[in-house]
Structure formats: C-alpha cells, structure tokens
Amino acid sequence: MKMFQSFFSNYIDINFFRNATLDQCLLLFYLSLFSLTNLFLIQKLFHANHTQHPLKKYFGETCLLEYIQIILSIVSAALSFYLDTNAVWWAIRTITHLEIVGLNILSSLKYGSTLFSWISVANAFGLLLLRLISIYDFLTYSSWSFSVKGGSFLLLLPLAYNITLFLLVIIPLFFPRAWSPTVKFSKVARPSPEQTCSIFSLIFTYGWLNGIIWKSWKKPITLTDVPALPDTECTQIWYSRFAKNDRKSLMHTILLSLKSTILLMVFLSVLVSSTLFVTPLAIKKLLQYLQNPKSDEGNSPFLWVFVLLIGPYLASVVKELYVHVSRRFMLRIKAAITQMIYKKVLTSKTLFVAVDGSKINLDYVYNLLAKDVDNIGEMREFIGIIARAPLEMGVSMYFLYQLLGWSAYVGLLLAILSSSFPLLVASKISRLTSIANTSSDERIRLTTELLKSIKITKLFGWERPMLSRIQEKRSFEVNNMYSLTLFDIIFKSGMKIAPFISMFITFAIYTKIMGHQLTPATAFTSISMFGLLRYQFIWLASVSRQFIQFKVSLKRVDNFVYGNMVNDSSIESSDSFVFENTSLSWSPTPSTALFQLKNLNFTIPRNQFTLVVGSTGSGKSTLAMALLGELHVISGKMTTPSISQRIAYVPQAAWLRNGTIRSNILFGEPYDEERYFQIIKACCLDSDLNSMNDGDLTYIHSNGSSLSGGQKQRVSLARALYSNAEVYIFDDIFSALDVSTSRKIYESCFLSTLLQHKTIILFTHNVSLCLPIAENVIVLKNSTAQLVSPDSIQELVPSTFFSSNTKKDNIEEENLEPHSFSFDSTLASSSDNDEQRDFASNSSIVLLGLHYLKYFGSNKYILGSILLVMMSQVSLASIHFWIALWSGNSLFSLKLPSSFSFLWGYAILLFIYFLMDLSRAITFAKGGRTASENIHDILSERVLYSPLHWFEKTAAGRILNRFSKDMYATDNLLWASLEGMLLCVMAILITMLNVTLVMPIFMVPAAFVSLLVYLHGYAYSKAQKQLTSLQSSRTSPVFTMLGETLGGITVIRAFKKEKIFEHENMAFIDDMIQPLYISFAINRWLAIRTDGISGLVGFSTGLIALLRQNIPPGLVGFSLNSAIGFNISVLVFVRANNEILTYINNFRRLYEYMLLPSEKNESSCLTKPMNKEWPTLGHVSIKNLTVSYSIGQAAVLEDINLEILPKEKIAIVGRTGSGKSTMGLTLLRFTMIMSGAVEVDGIDINSLDLEVLRQRISLIPQDPVLISGTVRSNLDPFEEYGDGELNEILKTASCESLVQASNKNSLDAFAIHLDTPVDSGGVNFSSGQRQILALARALVRKSRIVILDESTASVDDTTDRRIQQMLRAAFKHATVLCIAHRIKTIVDYDKVLVLDSGKTVEFGSPKSLYTQRRAFWKMCKESHISL
C-alpha cells in the first residue's frame, strides 16, 4: 500500500493541483480531453485522405474533418490561456498544449496531415520526459508516505489528467500514417505497409511485416504477396541522385548522394553505443546491492531488475533501427551502382576495348554485379565502426578506470596495440584476398568458356583434358582459399583473445600490485566492459578484411564506370556518311589495335543504295561497326548522319530478345496493324507464324534459340523495316537464307516501296543478286575501302563474285531439328522456376546435411570437431566461472586458493580456451576444404559427362550459377555456418546448465523463453527461406538483361533505344531489391522480438537473485553474465539456423547435379580387341537403324540401312527436319539407338568407349567455336604435334595467304601464326577465319571418318571454292559424310543420301539420282543446277 501511496504522491504531482481552483482543474482536464479527441479525429482524417473523401470536392484540398481539427485546436488554445497561474509547472503544461495546437494548425493548413504523426510523436516524447522525473522519483524511493489535503476529488481529477496525458503520449504511436507517391515515375502501384503503418509498428515492433510472416506460414508466397518496395527506395530516385552528384569518383558520388542517410546512421550509432552500457550498469548496481543491501538506501534494486528487462529491448530498438537504415543505405548503393554499370555498358564501345588497349572480359562485368557491388554496399559497416568504436572503447575504458583504477590503463594500452593489429596485417590480407579472388575468377572463366564450347568438347571427346584443366585451376583456388582462411582464423583468434589477456593483466595488477579485493560487482561489470572491448576487436578484425575487399571492389567498379571515357571529337554530324582520310580502330590507341581501316576517303550518298563487298576477312563487319560509331577515329575526320536521322541495323548474326516475336519486331514502336502485317509478308514470316500455335505471340527465349537461323534473320530484318528509319545498314542478311527466300525478300523489300527514298547500305557476298539495283559500290581490300560505280566493279573484285554459282543455293533454310542441340543462350540467363523452387523439407534437410558431412570427413573426424566445439565453449564458460570463484572468495565457506593461484588458474584456462578455439576453427576449415574439393570434383565430372541433350534443356546460366554462386556458398559459408550453429547450441546448453546449477528455478523461464523464441524463429525461417528463393529468381533477370544488352548493344544503340532499356533495367532492379529489402527487414522483426523475449531471462535471473538472499553475489554475477549471453546466443542460433537452411539449399542444388546420369557410366567393354589406329579403313555399316533422342520419345531416324565403303564421299541432303544432322550425331552416339546397329570397321559403336569413339571420328560443325588461348592450343590442345606439322596444316586449310601475310595491318592480311592470341569465342577473328581454323583443327586429327555439317556457310564464294578443293585433297584417304545445304558443293560426291522425315528416300550417285527425276532432281532444279 505504501508503494501505491508513493506512486500517487510522486507521479501525480498533487501539490501542484493543490494551489489551483476547481474550475482551473476542470478546464485543464477538459483541455486534455480535447487534445485526445483531436488525435482521434486526425486518425479519421488519414482514412479520408487515403480514400479521397467525397467532401473534398466541396471544401477543396482541406476536407471537413480538417476544419473540425482547426476548430478544436482554437478551443484548446483558448482554454489553455484561461488557465492563468504563476506556477512553473502549470506554465510548462500550457506552453506544451499551445505547441500542440499551433503545430496542429500548421500541419493542417500548410503541410497536410502526413506530417502530423511525426509532430505528435515529438510532442508526445516531450510530455513523456516530464513524466519520467516523477517515475524516477518513485522507483528510487527513500521512504513511502502519502498525504493529501483537499479530499479525494483533488486526487481523482489529477489522476484523470495524468491518464489522459499518458494516452496523449501513447496514442500517436499507434496512428496509421497517410501516404502519397514520392515521385511520379515510381513504379509502385500500392503503398508499402512500412509507409502507412503506425510509428509503434514502424520502430518498436516491425509489425508491418506481420502480414508477410503470416502468409508465408500458411502457403508458399509469390512476388505479389511480398510488401511493395517503398517508393522512396526506387532505383530511378537514387540513380538520378547519383547522376546529379556525379563527381567522376564513385566514393565522392556516394558520400554526396547519401549524406543525409550517413548522418542519420552516425546519430543512430551513437545511440546504439549509449544503450550498450545500460545493462552492465544495472548488473553492477544489482550486485552492489546484493553485496551490501544497506550500502545505498536511496536506490531501489527493483529499478535495476526492471532495467534488465527493458534495457535489452530498448537497446534492440535503437540497434535494429540503425541496422534497418544501414540496410537501406546498402540497397540504395546496390540499386544505383547496378544501374550505373548497366548505363556504362550501354554507352561503351563494342568489345569493351579499354584505353590501354586491353579487352574487358564480359565475365568481368558479371563479377562486378555479383560481387563488387555488394562489397561496396558493405561500407555501411565502416560508418558504424567509425562512429561506434571510439565511443564504445572510450566509455568502456572510462568505466574500467572507475572500477579498477589506474590498472585499467594497462588494458587501454593493450586495446590500442590490439586495434592497430589489423592495420599491420592489412597488406597480407589484401594480397591473399586478391590472389584468392583471381584464382576463383580464373576457374569461373574457364568453366564459362567450357560451357560455351561444350558441344565441340563433346564432339571431339575432350572431356578428360578439359576436366583436368578445370581441376588444376580448382586445386590452385582451394589452396589459396585455405591459406586465406587459415590466416583469417589465426588473426581473428588473436583478436578474440586480446581482451582476455588485457583482462588478465588488469586483474593481476589490480589485486597483486594495487592490493584491492576483486568483488563480484567489480569483476562482472569489468567482464561486461571487456566483453564490449572484445566485441569491438572482433568487429575490427572482421571489418578490416571487409575494408580490403571494399577498396578492391571500389577501385574495380570506379575504373569500369569512369574508365574508357573516350570522346571521339573527330566524329561530326551531317546528312550522310563522310570519310576524309580517316583511319579507324577498335582501340583508341593504334599501337594496340588488332585491326585498322586506313585512309578512307569516300562519301556514302544519302537516299541511295550502296553495296559493300569484299573477300572473307576484309573487314566488312568492321566497316559496318564504324558506320554505327562503334570504332575509334585514329586520324582524319568522320561525319555521320545527325541524331534526328534514325538508323536501323541488321547484324550478320541476328540478335533477338526474350519475349514474343511481335515484341521483337515492334522493338518499342507503337503497333500499326496494317504496316505490321505488310512487313511480316515482306519478310516471308507469314507462313512461319501460321505454323506456330501462338502465331506472332509465340515466346522466344534468349537470342531466339527456338527459331532457325533463317527465321531469326528474318525477324531481325522485320524489326529494321518496321522502324521506318532513314538509314538502313544490312550486314550479310542473305547468308542464313535459302535461295528462294533470298530472292523473295530481295523483291519484296528492296524492289518495293518499303525502302524507297532511304539510305541503304548492304554488306554481302551475294553480289550478283543485289548489283542490278546498286547505285554505289564500296570495295574493301588491303585494310582500306574504295567507292566505285557498279559498272567498274568487275575490274576490282574476283570474277567468282559474278559466276552463275555464286547464288546461295541452299536446299532449304535449315530449321532446328527436333531436340537438336542449341546452346547460344546467354550465360547470364537461368530459369526462374529452378531458382524459385521450394526449399528442401525438414527431413530432406537432415539428409542433405548428412550427405555434406560425408564429404566433410570421416565419422571420427566429425566427432572430434564436435568435441572441440564443446571444449571451446566449456573453456570459455570456465573462465567466467573461475572469476566468479575468485571475486566471491571471501563469501564462500570453502577454503579456496590464494589470489596468486587464481591468477595462474586464470592464465591456464585462458591458454586452454585459445588452444581449443584455434583448434576448433582450423578443424572446421580443413573439413570445409575437404568437402569443397570432393564436391567440386564430383560436380564437374558429372556435368561434363552429362548427355548433350541435357545441356540443350538446361540453361547455361543455371549451370554457371552452380559452379559460381552455389559453389561459393558451399566453399566459404556452409561449413562456417555449421560451425557457428554448433557453437550457439553449445553456448545455449552451457548457459542453461550454468544458471540452473545456481538457480534451479531458472529452468521455468528459460523453457518458456525457448518455446517463444522457437515459434518466432520457425515463423521467421519459413518466411526467410521463401524470400531468399524469390530473391534468387528476381536476381536472374538483371543478369539476363545485362547479357541480352551485351549481345545486342550495337542494335540497341543503332535504334536509339537506350532509354527504353534503361527504364526496363531499373524495373528489374526494383523487382530484385523488393524481396531483398523485406528479407533484411524481417531480420529486424525477429531480432527485436527475440531481444524482448530473451530480456525475460536476465530479468528472471535478477528477480530470483533479489528474492532469494542466499545466493553468493559472485555466482549471481556469473549467472547474470551467462543469462545476458543467452539472449545473444538464442538470436544468433535462430539466424544461424536460417543460414544453414539457405546454404544447405545451395548444396542441394549442387547435389542434384552430382547425381546426374553420366555418359561415362555407359558400357565401354569391347567385344573384341581394338587396334590403336582404329578405324584403319573407315568402313561404315548401318543396319536397320532406328534412333531417338531419349527414352520414351518418338523415333527421329527409322529403319536406315546403308553401306559406306572406305574413302567414299557421301552427301546427306533433305528438307527441314528430315534428320540430316541426326545422322551425324548418331555416328558419335549422341542419340539413343532403339534398334539396329552402326558398325565402324566391323565394331559396333555401342561397344566402344565414348571418348575413344569421338576422338577417332571428326565432326566439323556449322558454328565454329574457338577456345581462349592461342591458335596452337586450339589446333592441338594436348600438345601432340610439332610446330612444323601445325604450320603445314594451317597452310593446307586455305590459310596460306594469312600465314604468309605481309606487315600490312588488315584483317585479310593480318599474320596468323601459332602463337596468335585467341579471345574467348574467337571474337578477335572474323566468322570466316573462325571457320577456317575449325577446319584446320579437324585436319590435325587425321581421322579416317569425317563428318562435315555445312562448314563453309560463313565464307565468301571464293573462299568456299578453295576450301572445297582443300577438303577433297586433305580427306582423299578418309570417308567423308557431308551434311549439305548447298547442292553445288556435293555434285561431285560419290553418293547422295536423301532423307525425309527420318527415312531413306534415295541413295546413290548424284547422276543416277538426277536421272531418276525424283527428290534429288527437284532439289537440283530449285538450285538451278543441271547434271
């Protein structure tokens, strides 16, 4: 009763009311009610604003409820002035009410009600501050007394006033807030609940996330279920701000653009540091009271127990608010810099040739987005540590000095020395990190290239050597990672032990030299302070490594974004293309150029048809790039059409986007139905679209992989024609079309009104088709160009350009055969469905964990690792327990050792802890290394030996994600998270055991808290898993967009569609940020609840100790210290458990690939011994052959019977989908033989080892693939031949003119030798040169059986004739099967096989089949060939 009396006498301030008259008291109470009513009216007002209240049309922008608010505010003001009194507290209350009234009116009339909630909160906390004085007086009692003069009425009235005032403080915190879009261009169609929730939900509970938590508990969520991204976080806002504050330095740009956010983070960091000392102070005060209850009668111990309850929660509120703001800071950086990188891609020269001449690998750009952008975002950690570390260290040392006197200076000295340790090892960490990153990038680069060239790898049977190359890179990478990990472990262990050493030396000086008694209050408060220091040192150690990575990433991104800023001042604008003594190069510095066009002097007339011709490798495509402004002007002057003239460009290799055929043709232009179908017909697409189920709405994947080469080219042509541009540049558009389609397109496009009065520049080999309408001709030769009239062209170019056979006499435009292999999609793309699959179930998680441990080490090794975790945690707890015994020595009845013995015991325990902790970390790191090696070896082997059709249906980006993102998580994070979770489990168990031994009743609150934390953790985990999955699925489009842009950058810039692509990319970034933002936010949701719930543990421990007077203070301190650690361990355990689930999911995806069916497992037992030189004859016998691509699918070849004699030259022809390419693949066992057999020199190919089979039979594909390295490594990857032999093969493969080239710097005269560098994919060679090198590669093998799949499609007719002659001479002793698309190339073959729908139609010599006047005769007639 006395406590309640004291409460009323202190809290209600009854003495102030005693001097007031009754009417003044009533009016003040009435004033408070008006203020409270005013708040409720504002709440109604919010809903009126949000739903566009109908009364607004009568009252304008200010609705009726706002008028009511203003009237009530005036009444409140009048009532406040009536309360005229000289009392100071009455004046303060009146001023406070006037402030509320004035701000209410101001917010209503000028700023709108959106601001009101924040104003109310500010005033509410001001009023709350007045109340805290009385609350503190109550809790820090000296005596309980109560006396009221004036009766019970004067008691009830102020009580009602204070209740009203309390509600005035609380209610604004629960009001929802009004929302209006921040920017007009915001994509957000709905407000984020974060922007409309109450202040209480926003800051104190993160209750605005309850909806997504509940949805994820009930069902799988989709992106539409995720709360909208606040429109204040949209990419366009922050990209625009970065662009506005651009200082050509990324660091300066970030600081200027986010300065307000940085200042807020610094302010919150200071608050976080301040709240950290509340709990240690409460422990100290409580222990002092327990040591001597009569020492300070002015303080209530219940206050400090209450602080143990509320202190961790308030500290958590401030800390999580800081983390939330810092995560916003990070995501704003991620969004803006990602867009900056994309904008740089859009504005960089083709091939990304840097100023120094070096080429930036495209994988480099992907790494910038995947790693470096996130590393830069982690600068939030540096802001936090810069603001917090000095303050926390300084305050910790001040408290330590207050506790331990001058001995604390020793600890300060050690702290300074320890804090400088990261600086001393920074260079070492930087070097190791750089080496590890470089080795990882090299492995990813090699893996990427392998995926790009997987078809040629499997065709040539190169799996084993390619696997050896990858494993060699992998071994180097793992060794570097392990070295870095070991150094990091030793470094962090030293940083962790430093505060313990400092504590040991400080206690030794305090007790042995200064002669003081170490009391529990002093000891355990010091432990808390040293714990804060220890945390700072660990943080410094962690951040120092992050800082190194940050600097490296910042430099890389800065160099990319602001590097290569070359402005060609020599390029001017006019009405047409003009070259005046112009020299052009891919590089801005001519000394580093691989190729140049020199001394160009000509003008391309406007609105005329100009034909550009030249031999293979003469530089036609290079000139096309020059016209588009993609080359650098080295000397002279170049003039291009003004920006008002639109340019339409059709590249030689068609570029299409993910989307429908219609969207690819429209390409951002408005839909005009009449013109659209006119273009469709002109491009001969009408029949193709009619054959598709969805017509022009058929969805095509990246680069149109589901379309044939001719279809892709015609869609690309339709896109150009639909744009209705002023200038058209066509780069060899007829090479992918058959003769009939070429003629139709020539007539419907070039001879129609579609291209009338347009500037047309056509690069082509098909001179005879287009010359009749050409008004000008540009002839490319010897790295220069000459503009001539059509009449004089025959004097400058070979006569073969005009021969009757120069037409492309393709049998028919080749569609992709059913299930044929196509692997030209971008490596950045991956299936959303794959990434968005549900995480593994709980049971499968356990199984996956056990599978991982199988690769981690033996059972004994795993058991030893777990024991080391337990021993390290036990040794850590033993240190604190030893200090408890030491500090409570005088309070125990037992005979305990002297203080000197305690010091030695402390030192021994310290050494044991260091040894156990170091051993535990090294053991787990070594196990993680073993697991990484084993997993990658199995993964790479399984993927490399997978059937070719698996690569067809599996996106290349998905495979690359396994070897990069998922492998990185397994290499570095999975074992570390497993270790961290085990540490948390042991810490929780040991904490509960420690406190329970001292206070058995502690098990009750501990069990209750554990249950609550488990339920919250389970809800959190379900939501986090699904958000992580969504995040993965929404990240892929950003990389896919980048890949698409890189593939079609010249097309995008030519059509001037950069703005469309920029906005589309920003939309993708917003979609990527949305689940990531919520994912970070629900971490705050969990942390603030876990801290609040776990605060019950410290509160329960303190309350039990206070109520039970028989527990020694030393053990109470030990229990409290353990209980506070329990809070942290519980939260870390929940997060570690979620991390384990995430990283186990990464391992699950790897494990799925580790179980792929392997071609290597197929039978390789020979039915009879095989000659090492097999096949010696090249005799092929096919008997009753029926094949399909996989089990359960329809047959693609049926009942084929052939007898191919040694050295015979067989041509395989047929219409689209007839099975020509399938026949070639069957000989190499890329299909499944359902019945029949194929024998080579009498041996069934099913009985042969696949690698042997594919190494002995050569298939030259239509699409030549070169691997980075040199010409030598491409011809002879296993180094089996000498230079002399390889040079002879180069000459034989029609490359003699290239090998014997002069020093002229031209592409057709550029000296190719064995050491000539080859870029990835051979991009530094023309398509014709790549095809010639691919032919030379086949010649090196000297195979007895050679399969040619239209291997001359990318060369001009002159080169084609030379290659055909070379093939006849080089393979005269070999059996040749030519899959032909041009009749003219096979008329002199021994036999022709005509296929139709997978069946044999005709088989015999060309002349005999021609005389039969059947299928082959019709093909010859269509190609205008007579035999």
UniProtKB/Swiss-Prot annotation:
<feature type="glycosylation site" description="N-linked (GlcNAc...) asparagine">
    <location>
        <position position="601"/>
    </location>
</feature>
<feature type="domain" description="ABC transporter 1">
    <location>
        <begin position="579"/>
        <end position="807"/>
    </location>
</feature>
<feature type="transmembrane region" description="Helical">
    <location>
        <begin position="155"/>
        <end position="175"/>
    </location>
</feature>
<feature type="domain" description="ABC transporter 2">
    <location>
        <begin position="1180"/>
        <end position="1422"/>
    </location>
</feature>
<feature type="transmembrane region" description="Helical">
    <location>
        <begin position="995"/>
        <end position="1015"/>
    </location>
</feature>
<protein>
    <recommendedName>
        <fullName>ATP-binding cassette transporter abc1</fullName>
    </recommendedName>
</protein>
<dbReference type="InterPro" id="IPR011527">
    <property type="entry name" value="ABC1_TM_dom"/>
</dbReference>
<feature type="transmembrane region" description="Helical">
    <location>
        <begin position="609"/>
        <end position="629"/>
    </location>
</feature>
<dbReference type="InterPro" id="IPR027417">
    <property type="entry name" value="P-loop_NTPase"/>
</dbReference>
<dbReference type="GO" id="GO:0042626">
    <property type="term" value="F:ATPase-coupled transmembrane transporter activity"/>
</dbReference>
<feature type="transmembrane region" description="Helical">
    <location>
        <begin position="1223"/>
        <end position="1243"/>
    </location>
</feature>
<dbReference type="InterPro" id="IPR050173">
    <property type="entry name" value="ABC_transporter_C-like"/>
</dbReference>
<feature type="transmembrane region" description="Helical">
    <location>
        <begin position="1114"/>
        <end position="1134"/>
    </location>
</feature>
<feature type="transmembrane region" description="Helical">
    <location>
        <begin position="513"/>
        <end position="533"/>
    </location>
</feature>
<dbReference type="GO" id="GO:0005524">
    <property type="term" value="F:ATP binding"/>
</dbReference>
<feature type="glycosylation site" description="N-linked (GlcNAc...) asparagine">
    <location>
        <position position="842"/>
    </location>
</feature>
<keyword id="KW-0812">Transmembrane</keyword>
<feature type="domain" description="ABC transmembrane type-1 1">
    <location>
        <begin position="262"/>
        <end position="549"/>
    </location>
</feature>
<feature type="transmembrane region" description="Helical">
    <location>
        <begin position="63"/>
        <end position="83"/>
    </location>
</feature>
<comment type="similarity">
    <text>Belongs to the ABC transporter superfamily. ABCC family. Conjugate transporter (TC 3.A.1.208) subfamily.</text>
</comment>
<feature type="transmembrane region" description="Helical">
    <location>
        <begin position="1086"/>
        <end position="1106"/>
    </location>
</feature>
<dbReference type="InterPro" id="IPR003593">
    <property type="entry name" value="AAA+_ATPase"/>
</dbReference>
<dbReference type="InterPro" id="IPR036640">
    <property type="entry name" value="ABC1_TM_sf"/>
</dbReference>
<feature type="transmembrane region" description="Helical">
    <location>
        <begin position="115"/>
        <end position="135"/>
    </location>
</feature>
<feature type="glycosylation site" description="N-linked (GlcNAc...) asparagine">
    <location>
        <position position="1324"/>
    </location>
</feature>
<dbReference type="GO" id="GO:0016020">
    <property type="term" value="C:membrane"/>
</dbReference>
<dbReference type="InterPro" id="IPR003439">
    <property type="entry name" value="ABC_transporter-like_ATP-bd"/>
</dbReference>
<feature type="transmembrane region" description="Helical">
    <location>
        <begin position="197"/>
        <end position="217"/>
    </location>
</feature>
<feature type="glycosylation site" description="N-linked (GlcNAc...) asparagine">
    <location>
        <position position="437"/>
    </location>
</feature>
<feature type="domain" description="ABC transmembrane type-1 2">
    <location>
        <begin position="862"/>
        <end position="1142"/>
    </location>
</feature>
<dbReference type="Pfam" id="PF00005">
    <property type="entry name" value="ABC_tran"/>
</dbReference>
<dbReference type="GO" id="GO:0005783">
    <property type="term" value="C:endoplasmic reticulum"/>
</dbReference>
<feature type="transmembrane region" description="Helical">
    <location>
        <begin position="973"/>
        <end position="993"/>
    </location>
</feature>
<feature type="glycosylation site" description="N-linked (GlcNAc...) asparagine">
    <location>
        <position position="49"/>
    </location>
</feature>
<feature type="glycosylation site" description="N-linked (GlcNAc...) asparagine">
    <location>
        <position position="567"/>
    </location>
</feature>
<feature type="transmembrane region" description="Helical">
    <location>
        <begin position="345"/>
        <end position="367"/>
    </location>
</feature>
<feature type="transmembrane region" description="Helical">
    <location>
        <begin position="26"/>
        <end position="46"/>
    </location>
</feature>
<feature type="glycosylation site" description="N-linked (GlcNAc...) asparagine">
    <location>
        <position position="581"/>
    </location>
</feature>
<feature type="transmembrane region" description="Helical">
    <location>
        <begin position="397"/>
        <end position="417"/>
    </location>
</feature>
<dbReference type="GO" id="GO:0140359">
    <property type="term" value="F:ABC-type transporter activity"/>
</dbReference>
<keyword id="KW-0813">Transport</keyword>
<keyword id="KW-0547">Nucleotide-binding</keyword>
